[in-house]
Amino acid sequence: KKLLESPYADPNRAHNPQKEIYRHSAGGNYNVAAFDAGQAYQLALRWKISGDTQCADKAVQILNDWARTCTDGVNQTQYQTDSHRLLAAGFIGYQFANPAEIMRDYEGWKKEDFEFFKEWITKTFYPICYEFLGDHFNSEPEDGWMSWDLPAMLTILSIGVLCDDADKINFALRYFYEGEGMGCIENSVVAMHEDPAGRVQGKHLAQSQEMGRDQGHATLNVPLHAYFCQTAYNIGIDLFSYKDNIVLDLCEYTAKYNVNPNETVDLPYTPYYSGKEGWHNVVASDGRGRQRPGWELIYNHYVKIKGVNAPYSQEFAETMRPEGGGERGTAEACDLGFGTLMYTR
């Protein structure tokens, strides 16, 4: 029902492919790409569930039209910094890759069009993400954020899976394990804490690198980690279990602080130095309570599949259920959403 109520799941909604994708401090047109990718994803889900070929044909049309129209890719404009270029490529790339992966078996998507789409998504989004993770645009890796590295990693992994490209898959996975930047799981965690409330046993609350920045970005890392781990899981690689479920530990810490934003929370916190902003001495309250998709995936994987306790993630999933596509419940520039539909066990 949530999916059917979304205006982006309507095959009659007009899409709007652009010649280039750009993002800057005043906005840009990247949202146009994100919402069209979200529409393709939601229509692909409708086709996969119901077999509705009208939805399938529209999803394919969106993907084909973007591949044919967006010839200038993610361009550097006079208003756009390198970080804006990276964020446009990182967040849009994986969102186009996901509906394409669903639709790859649809007989109505011509083989030559599918091959052209794979070429387009690779040349448009991959080079920027690879360059950024390689040298962070000639800056120090610690000067960046988790929410910069993670979408770049996710887009490379998603393109690798879509294109059956083992080199891209392995690059993204290696970065998760041992990369220099904040997307590496070793660098994502500032400190491990015990839960003063006793709901999480042992030192299994992981304070993430952006908890002292603001909660809008800290909560964004939950779906990014969730989608990255799920994409790997779909090809037989279990990152969810890595280092005794450390991704869950990150999510539990974030959920504990954000799930009930008006309540006082006894939250242990370790001050840390950010290369981008200096010392973060207290947990940031800005944006506290931000609701994003991703909690259903985390909850269902850890609790329903693995049988692991995840009280705060479970509470967040229950709060947002049924999960739509972003805070607006339809589509959002950073998140695919619809986890209740996709991951409920």
Region roles according to the model:
Residues K1-N138, L150, L154, R174-Y177, ...:
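Extracellular glycan-targeting catalytic surfaces
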Residues W145-W148, H217:
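Histidine-centered active-site/metal-ligand motif
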Residues D167-F171, A191, A197, E210-I235:
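Active-site-proximal binding-pocket segments
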Residues E178-M182:
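Solenoid-like repeat scaffolds
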Residues G183-E210, E277, N281:
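Flexible internal linker/loop segments at domain or repeat junctions
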